[in-house]
């Protein structure tokens, strides 16, 4: 699978489009988009240009030669949120454990 195929999938998901929606906007079928994303076929230059336009990226970004700042910022925020969620889950487990201890203590009285 080429970087273009990976990036089509990455940017499509980032924009919240289904394969069918992207395909419709660029004049290709859902199956064609699916085949690209799985690396079974490569998009031609016209399809790449159309996908860039719909997905709001430059050809340099699609080919991986340049980073996409909006995408990078989004995933940095997602990473921070995931870390915070893990911390909250650990705190929740500690609270659950403490509550279980209190319940046991109260029931033993």
Regions found by a protein language model. Name each.
Residues 7, 18, 44-47, 58:
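Residues that mark the N-terminal boundary/hinge immediately upstream of a DNA-recognition element
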Residues 27-43, 64-65:
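Recognition helix of helix-turn-helix/homeodomain-like DNA-binding domains
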Residues 27, 46-61:
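DNA major-groove recognition helix of helix-turn-helix/homeodomain DNA-binding modules
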Residues 16-35, 50:
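Short alpha-helical DNA-recognition segment
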Residues 1-3, 73-74:
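A detector for short, charged/polar N-terminal pre-domain segments
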Residues 68-109:
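Interfacial/linker helices and their anchor residues that mediate assembly or domain coupling
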Residues 2, 13-14, 42:
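Short amphipathic helical patch at the helix-1/turn junction of helix-turn-helix
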Residues 6-25, 84-85:
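Short basic helix-loop element that most often maps to the first helix and adjoining turn
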